[in-house]
Regions:
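Active-site-adjacent beta->alpha loops and helix N-cap segments on the catalytic face
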Residues: 101-105, 161-174, 195-196, 211-227, ...
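Glycine-rich, proline-tolerant flexible connector loops at the mouths of alpha/beta enzymes
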Residues: 152-170, 327-339
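Catalytic beta/alpha-barrel core
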Residues: 32, 185-193, 205-216, 229-240, ...
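Active-site mouth loops of central-metabolism enzymes
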Residues: 121-138, 162-166, 188-190, 211, ...
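Catalytic alpha/beta core domains of metabolic enzymes, predominantly
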Residues: 226-325
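Non-catalytic terminal accessory/regulatory regions of metabolic enzymes
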Residues: 3, 10-123
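Alpha-helix-loop-beta-strand connector modules within alpha/beta enzyme cores
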Residues: 166-188, 223-229, 280-292, 338-360
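Hydrophobic faces of well-ordered beta-strands that scaffold small-molecule active sites
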Residues: 122-127, 151-153, 187-189, 207-209, ...
């Protein structure tokens, strides 16, 4: 008889008076009923040939082979093809570099002198799209005075419609750099194409990868070759594991300075632009050591939703906020409806500061 007991997430297998901790079992192979001894041995050999140890558990209704060792690079289908195997289940997460189990301490990412993670909040503010030097300069000055420590602005804009404003491109990037020199805020902007990797690596302090490119694996691999930190937004339909695995692509390619950004997921609800998944913060805090910030602007798509969602995100333990701020949102070329005016952003940060103090953080 197989018995499993759960206590504080620690499971034990009891079999033939031998106790194996659940944490030692990294993959479980469930065999089909009435599998012969010969076939059990064959499957065990398949496992050991991959450099793993096995632990056989015989139950009244099923037989299970527990795989002990590093299974992160092993495809379960290698075992599923055997005629005696019913199913294979991973117990060990397939990501390693991003895994808190291998890196218990929270990571703190330095963005040109601004630390994201730990006790200080990363506060990213600015317009959805760069429209002019004067526009970005005014917003940056006011946002910095309110407490923002990074400047965002879209130079290249991924739009659903090919007829929508696509951004100023390299001209917009030059404007951001000029405002950075004037105001002193490090800049954050989205990279869409590998052809701009070199110029972004030279000029951008925090390179943003948008939701649409979260699983652009060729691009993620290239980002691993850069020495700039990466802000990785969650895809519209991405699970937690898929999101972390995308971060793992960047880290496995050589760049471990990755910040995760929750920006809402697509659900059945159509009243809001997306649904902000705030429970991702404690979940990811448990699964990974990477910093987690929240973008409440893109989540709701409405400016009046930004304030309550931003405060809720900080209360839930987010390491920062990415908020769209515009001096004239009614005339904005992109996403004006979800942008805060500078005075509203200033009022919001005063409240955020109070919440941050309660949870041991500061602006």
């Amino acid at each position: 008889m197989i018995q499993m007991f759960s206590h504080f997430n620690q499971l034990k297998f009891y079999s033939a008076n031998v106790i194996v901790l659940w944490e030692d079992i990294k993959m479980i192979i469930v065999l089909k009923p009435n599998t012969t001894e010969k076939n059990i041995t064959r499957v065990e050999n398949l496992v050991t040939n991959r450099g793993l140890d096995t632990h056989l558990v015989r139950g009244t209704e099923m037989t299970i082979i527990g795989c002990i060792g590093d299974t992160t690079l092993i495809d379960p289908r290698l075992f599923e093809v055997d005629e005696s195997v019913d199913k294979v289940m991973h117990v060990q997460e397939p990501y390693k570099l991003a895994n808190r189990a291998f890196h218990p301490e929270d990571s703190i990412i330095d963005v040109s002198g601004v630390q994201i993670g730990g006790d200080h909040l990363g506060l990213i503010a600015g317009p959805c799209s760069v429209e002019s030097f004067e526009q970005v300069l005014e917003i940056a000055q006011k946002a910095k005075a309110s407490g923002a420590n990074l400047l965002r602005g879209g130079a290249f804009k991924p739009r659903t419609s090919p007829y929508s404003f696509q951004g100023l491109g390299l001209e917009g990037l030059d404007i951001l750099c000029a405002v950075k020199e004037e105001v002193g805020l490090p800049i954050v902007t989205e990279l869409m194409s590998p052809k701009y990797l070199d110029v972004f690596n030279e000029k951008v302090d925090l390179i943003q990868i948008g939701a649409r490119n979260m699983q652009n694996f060729d691009l993620l691999k290239e980002l691993g070759q850069l020495d700039r930190p990466i802000l990785l937004k969650r895809g519209l339909n991405a699970t937690y594991e898929e999101w972390i695995m995308s971060a793992e692509y960047i880290m496995a390619s050589g760049n471990e300075n990755v910040i995760l950004c929750e920006r809402g997921i697509r659900t059945f609800e159509t009243y809001t632009r997306n649904t902000l998944d705030l429970q991702c913060i404690p979940v990811l805090r448990k699964k990974t050591h990477l910093p987690i910030i929240v973008d409440p602007s893109h989540a709701g798509g409405k400016w009046w939703l930004v304030e309550p969602m931003a405060k809720a995100a900080i209360a839930a333990g987010a390491d920062g906020l990415m908020i769209e701020v515009h001096n004239n949102p009614e005339a904005a070329l992109c996403d004006g409806a979800q942008s805060l005016k500078p005075e509203k952003y200033d009022a919001l940060l005063k409240q955020v500061s109070q919440i941050a103090t309660v949870i041991g953080k500061s602006l």
